[in-house]
């Protein structure tokens, strides 16, 4: 009853030393806190603890990197199919950084860390990274170095940068390797190091795939495969390799949940 009767309220929100005062309608409170990435009802101490947890995860990964003589580790948002929207099992970048946007890459060094993301997420990333050891790098701005340029500036010749090769295309790896080797920096495919510290990681999706009905798909998978073969023949190509989940699902009329 009290919530329904109140039309305005004045409140002070403290976030890492900054104070925000705002006079708002009561029904705007939830959206305000959502923009601040602090759910309504969550305490300030819980918010602080979340940031501390992110920093602890980063430090744990740094210890693994040090044990393997790796000076930096690159964590993209993708899964092994290079999807932008991934299953919880593959949300490694989100887990290590606290940033929940669909696109972004985290780079962890011994003394610094950064997140690169595009303009869709500049505001969200700034809010979610606040209080962590991670610096936001806004992609495509003149003053923002690319990840490779950043690494060349911060990694010494002879040192090694690690990646999980499953999460990158061959082209991406080749481009990075060319630039890094020009600076005598090594690129090593060393597996999923983050998984070694993510103790409560969700399991791999195991729900069954199902056939998408022809009345919705429009064409059978046989028709689609024959159309692809016709295109390949026209271009003098022997075969086509598909790894993207949406392309596989479309071609074979498969869906999942």
Q: Which residues fall in each region the model found?
A:
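Extreme N-terminal basic, low-complexity initiation segments
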Residues: 1-13, 214
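Terminal domain-start leader segments
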Residues: 44-257
């Amino acid at each position: 009853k009290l919530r329904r009767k109140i039309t305005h309220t004045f409140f002070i929100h403290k976030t890492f030393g900054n104070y925000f005062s705002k006079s708002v309608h009561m029904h705007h409170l939830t959206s305000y806190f959502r923009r601040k990435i602090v759910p309504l009802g969550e305490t300030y101490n819980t918010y602080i603890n979340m940031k501390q947890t992110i920093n602890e995860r980063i430090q744990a990964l740094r210890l693994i990197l040090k044990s393997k003589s790796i000076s930096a580790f690159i964590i993209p948002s993708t899964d092994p199919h290079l999807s932008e929207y991934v299953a919880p099992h593959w949300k490694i970048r989100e887990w290590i950084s606290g940033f929940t946007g669909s696109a972004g890459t985290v780079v962890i060094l011994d003394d610094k860390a950064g997140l690169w993301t595009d303009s869709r997420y500049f505001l969200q990333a700034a809010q979610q990274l606040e209080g962590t050891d991670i610096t936001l790098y806004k992609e495509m701005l003149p003053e923002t170095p690319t990840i490779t340029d950043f690494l060349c500036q911060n990694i010494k010749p002879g040192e090694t940068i690690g990646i999980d090769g499953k999460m990158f295309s061959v082209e991406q790896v080749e481009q990075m390797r060319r630039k890094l080797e020009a600076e005598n920096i090594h690129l090593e495919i060393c597996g999923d190091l983050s998984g070694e510290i993510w103790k409560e990681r969700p399991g791999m999706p195991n729900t069954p795939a199902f056939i998408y009905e022809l009345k919705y798909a429009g064409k059978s998978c046989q028709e689609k495969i024959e159309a692809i073969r016709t295109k390949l023949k026209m271009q003098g190509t022997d075969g086509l390799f598909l790894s993207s989940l949406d392309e596989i699902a479309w071609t074979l009329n498969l869906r999942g949940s």
